[in-house]
Amino acid sequence: MTDFRRLFLSVFIAFLLIFSTPSAYSLPLPITENTSSEFLNLGVDQMRRGNYNKAIENFNQAIQLQPDFTVAYSDRCLAYLQLQDYYQAVTDCTQAINLATENVEPYLNRGLAHYRQGNYLAAIANYNQAIALKPDDFRAYYNRGLACAGEGNYPEAIANYNLALTQIPQTTSLPLANIYNDRGLVRFELQDFAAAMLDFDLAIRLNPQDYRAYFNRACACGRNGDNFGAVRDFSQVIRLNTSNALAYVNRGVASYRLGYHQKAIADLQTASEYFGHQGNRVAYKKTLDLLKSLRQQIQLATEIA
């Protein structure tokens, strides 16, 4: 049977918009510094509003007036990350690092750009630098864990997630949930389903509104043969994210295995409609093929009976 299982990966980077704080001088500040700082602040404001192209325009002005403005390069890097222009993000982070080698943020963000490009080894190298500069920053361990998982080095990924858990403030429930969710994914890949379930349970307890952990726990239930648990969790995914076609497919498969044939057919029909509306032609065709196969199997079972 077609395996529609998809596990979700959550990348957490605390994008820190950096503000420049003018130092106290006995003499008036140069006009250029004031103006560049104003452009920087305008850019930061546009970032907060989600206007990333406008933010870049302001950061460009700040850099034109002050070519060694480290903060402007760092913040422009963040804007490019949001626009998924990873080449420019790497370029700006590199310039920020050249201007201030002891600043952790550009290493974290350049690592993220490399990670999203699929260049996991380069990402790991940047996170190593960040950890050397700031050994108590959980983000570097967590992101290095993600990159290790991308490389398929699951034991090292788990080790980094564990280190992140030792450094993260226990009051930050959403980042904690992400770490447990991603550690659960790695344990799932290692077929340690019991440990994966425990991590997904913790992720759900910390963030009960995140459908991804329910989806992942449902997949683990299915692999354990717990189709009732799979139906329960896929149903919760659908309650939280009504257009999640994959959840309908997987709930349909679990329902079929439980003998609820009409519910299975209804879910697959709904899934095909969502895939069609979303323009996902490959998934749409595969769902129709699966629907046809299930109907044939149901008909055959009826004839034999």
Walk through the language-model features, giving the residues of each:
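Alpha-helical tetratricopeptide repeat
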Residues: 2-305
